[in-house]
Amino acid sequence: MNQTPDFIIFAQHGWADTHHAIAALAKNLATPQSHLVTPNLGWLKTWWRIEPLIQHVERVATETITQYPDTPIRIIGHSMGGLIWLEILNQHPEWWYQIESFVLVASPIGGADLARLIDPFSVGIGMAGALGINRRQIAQSIAKKIPTLVIAGDRDRGSDGTIIVESTKFSGAKFVSIPNLAHAQLKNHPTVIGIIREFWANPTITNPYPLDFTAQLIERLQSIPGMTDAHPRDFPRSQPYITLANGFTIRIWTSPLHVDHIFVANPEGECLYSGFVGWRHRGALHQVLAEIGNQ
């Protein structure tokens, strides 16, 4: 008779990848009695559509949870792997009570900027259509019920070289940024292992902090249809568009492709947020900016 595991650990790889690195991460974190589940989606299949990948992981998860209905669950998702699990958990709230923790490593919850540039009209070009979706509302709902940790790498003061740091954040999750780690390194790195292990020692729900002025302004901009978090590297190119009474400024830079990039700066001129909207949502952006300017 098989011994019941003390934990089920689901660890899911992401786009343009296989399971090997994140399986090693899970093995490093596991107790001797843990049951590891690390589905290999296949490198090539991760380039096409996300729906079959979600269905694959969902089938494996259903079989595992049916086999061990009372075993606590720990979930780790790297990059697109985190997005896959967001979609699965959104479809299966009946599993939430069993999940002890949810760890998202370098997952573009707000939408990947590279994906939005590839698929600016959201028509579903390959995997870009799925990676460019803003899933913050889903993530925030889950984080209210499941202890959630977000880990991001910051190698160039804004991204891990692939995923924008700001795109990984959402209200209700514990957030940890690791300097000088690239996207691929985050799949299995001693620092990441240490952070997850510390979180697992005391997994608790993170109560959202009251929104200050800056957070409210950024949240309002992020709520604009089509707004995608962007790297702040183009901040020096921007010009003040709205100067608020408290000295904060909203700045704009229009790229050579006529894409509007928006920035929020404090009175000291430091960039606090950067994002962009495509041609399709330019009108919505300027409508909100007009409302902010008239307040």
Residue ranges and their predicted role:
Residues 3-7:
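A short, charged/proline- and glycine-enriched loop
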Residues 9-15, 19-20, 29-30, 35-151, ...:
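Serine-dependent carboxylesterase/thioesterase catalytic core
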Residues 25-26:
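Typically the conserved alpha-helix immediately C-terminal to a functionally engaged Cys/Sec
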Residues 47-48, 181-190, 261-262:
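Catalytic histidine-centered segment of alpha/beta-hydrolase-like enzymes
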Residues 52, 187-202:
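Post-His helix in hydrolase/transferase enzymes
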Residues 61, 65, 196-209:
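Short, hydrophobic alpha-helical segments
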Residues 150-152, 157-184:
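Active-site-adjacent alpha-helix of alpha/beta-hydrolase-fold enzymes
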Residues 210-295:
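Extended non-globular C-terminal regions
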